């Protein structure tokens, strides 16, 4: 028995653990889990070693019924109790990796997709870090049953206008109990909208954290009688929810993006990484903004990125370079939203950026104007293109991008495209209230 497993068993015994949740995500990033009754604490050693068989054909995006057997193996580094369920101290959780019965990694496991990309560049000495900024809405219902924001607060408001203060405090405390390093929490721009940021970390740990973060929020809000949504654009005329992703590369403990001897203090690698993100932005959008609703957020006028450009401290461009330098030097990609699968999104972002470094893709000069104030003809003269304006455009861009397809791998790419084609066709044929209001009197 390893020391790590020994410490886990001791902690489980201390907490009186009676059930172990084995958790993973489907192709959408939606958490799934199995609960195992624990007869004795050292039983977990066998579970970690041998895993547990499950039916993968019942999970969207995994396997067909004729090859349904898959194996869940807990990652010991993800052990935690669930602080938002204090009445059930006897429950712990592991995030799992998925394997075929012969011991080979299952290529349709989103967590494996990210681990594969990270391992590829770890061999070259690179460590990829991500710091996400997920936004979300807390919702209520009016007397007619309509979904409404739970408050009328705006950016950085305080109580009583901001009615989410106590909720955010509770959530931050629970996240810290899960070893999150929370940096800040606040009310966002739209009524009922909030943001909690946690410090950047290694990409795999961060992706695990995003899944846990969303799960914790939904559990806590449900207990106080409200709803929470990570839907990108739940209300017309209001800002949508994004998940801006701050990214950096480290090598031998040093930030690869930092060069104190250049005018901007950005290294060549940083600029090439930006160049890769810009080049592959249309295909990246399919993975990082993966729903039909995502594209109702990505429109001018609501602080969401639309134009494929980068700037220093410029929040109107797709990519922003925050002012921090040294170990804090980073690139902020502003198009992702919290409906994305973080494992797939981080893998795709890493491959896009590294493709830029490997091929020395020059991003050009930074854009320091407010691009929202320019016409399309002016932007085209400047060489600035737009992101896809619909899921249909985005998945067609993905079809043409071998780098992002390669990041996903053949299995995930094919399943992802099947699902997105169905999603678009289902959306395309529906008749909405707007159409009845606009065209019924024809």
UniProtKB/Swiss-Prot annotation:
GS beta-grasp domain ranges (all copies): 15-103
Protein keywords: ATP-binding, Cytoplasm, Ligase, Magnesium, Metal-binding, Nucleotide-binding
Places the protein is found: Cytoplasm
SMART domains, A to Z: Gln-synt_C
PROSITE patterns: GLNA_1, GLNA_ATP, GS_BETA_GRASP, GS_CATALYTIC
Cofactor(s) needed for function: Mg(2+)
Biological processes per GO annotation: glutamine biosynthetic process
Residues binding Mg(2+) 2: 135, 188, 195
Binding site for ATP: 183, 246-248, 315, 320, 327
Sequence positions that bind L-glutamate: 239-240, 297, 303, 315, 334
Annotated Gene Ontology cellular component terms: cytoplasm; membrane
GO molecular function annotation: ATP binding; glutamine synthetase activity; metal ion binding
Cofactor: record remark: Binds 2 Mg(2+) ions per subunit.
Reaction(s) catalysed by this chain's protein: L-glutamate + NH4(+) + ATP = L-glutamine + ADP + phosphate + H(+)
Binding site for Mg(2+) 1: 133, 244, 332
Enzyme Commission number: 6.3.1.2
InterPro entries: Gln_synt_N, Gln_synt_N_sf, Gln_synth/guanido_kin_cat_dom, Gln_synth_cat_dom, Gln_synth_gly_rich_site, Gln_synth_I, Gln_synth_N_conserv_site
Residue ranges of every copy of the GS catalytic domain listed in the record: 110-442
Oligomeric and partner information: Oligomer of 12 subunits arranged in the form of two hexagons.
Alphabetized PANTHER family for the sequence: GLUTAMINE SYNTHETASE, LENGSIN
Family: Belongs to the glutamine synthetase family.
Function summary: Probably involved in nitrogen metabolism via ammonium assimilation. Catalyzes the ATP-dependent biosynthesis of glutamine from glutamate and ammonia.
Protein name, per record: Glutamine synthetase
Species for this entry: Methanothermobacter thermautotrophicus (strain ATCC 29096 / DSM 1053 / JCM 10044 / NBRC 100330 / Delta H)
Highest classification ranks of the organism: Archaea, Methanobacteriati, Methanobacteriota, Methanomada group, Methanobacteria
């Amino acid at each position: 028995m390893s020391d790590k497993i020994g410490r886990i068993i001791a902690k489980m015994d201390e907490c009186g653990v009676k059930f172990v949740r084995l958790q993973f995500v489907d192709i959408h990033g939606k958490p799934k889990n199995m609960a195992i009754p624990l007869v004795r604490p050292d039983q977990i050693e066998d579970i970690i070693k041998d895993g547990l068989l499950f039916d993968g054909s019942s999970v969207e995006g995994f396997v067909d019924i004729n090859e349904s057997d898959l194996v869940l193996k807990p990652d010991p580094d993800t052990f935690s109790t669930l602080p938002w369920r204090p009445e059930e101290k006897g429950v712990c959780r592991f995030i799992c990796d998925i394997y075929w019965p012969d011991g080979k990694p299952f290529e349709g496991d989103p967590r494996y997709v990210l681990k594969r990309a990270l391992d590829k560049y770890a061999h070259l000495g690179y460590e990829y870090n991500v710091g996400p900024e997920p936004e979300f809405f807390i919702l209520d219902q009016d007397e007619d049953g309509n979904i409404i924001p739970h408050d009328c607060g705006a950016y950085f408001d305080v109580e009583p206008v901001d009615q989410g203060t106590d909720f955010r405090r509770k959530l931050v405390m629970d996240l810290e109990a899960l070893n999150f390093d929370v940096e800040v929490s606040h009310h966002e721009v739209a009524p009922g909208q909030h943001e909690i940021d946690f410090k950047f970390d290694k990409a795999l740990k961060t992706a695990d954290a995003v899944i846990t973060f969303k799960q914790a929020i939904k559990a806590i809000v449900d207990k106080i009688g409200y709803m929470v949504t990570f839907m990108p654009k739940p209300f017309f005329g209001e800002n949508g929810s994004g998940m801006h992703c701050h990214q950096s590369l480290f090598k031998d403990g040093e930030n690869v993006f930092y060069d104190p001897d250049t005018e901007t203090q950005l290294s060549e690698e940083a600029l090439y990484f930006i160049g890769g993100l810009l080049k592959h932005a249309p295909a990246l959008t399919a993975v990082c903004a993966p729903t039909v609703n995502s594209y109702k957020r990505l429109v001018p006028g609501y602080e969401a990125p639309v134009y494929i450009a980068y700037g220093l401290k410029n929040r109107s461009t797709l990519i922003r370079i925050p002012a921090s330098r040294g170990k804090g030097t980073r690139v902020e990609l502003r198009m992702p939203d919290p409906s994305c699968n973080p494992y797939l999104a981080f893998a795709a972002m890493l491959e896009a950026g590294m493709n830029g470094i490997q091929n020395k893709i020059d991003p050009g000069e930074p854009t320091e104007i407010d691009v929202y104030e320019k016409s399309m003809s002016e932007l085209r003269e400047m060489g600035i293109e737009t992101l896809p304006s619909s899921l249909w455009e985005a998945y067609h861009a993905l079809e043409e991008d071998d780098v992002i397809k390669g990041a996903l791998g053949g299995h995930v790419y094919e399943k992802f495209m099947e699902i997105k084609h169905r999603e678009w066709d289902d959306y395309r044929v529906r008749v909405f209230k707007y159409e009845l209001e606009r065209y019924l009197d024809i």
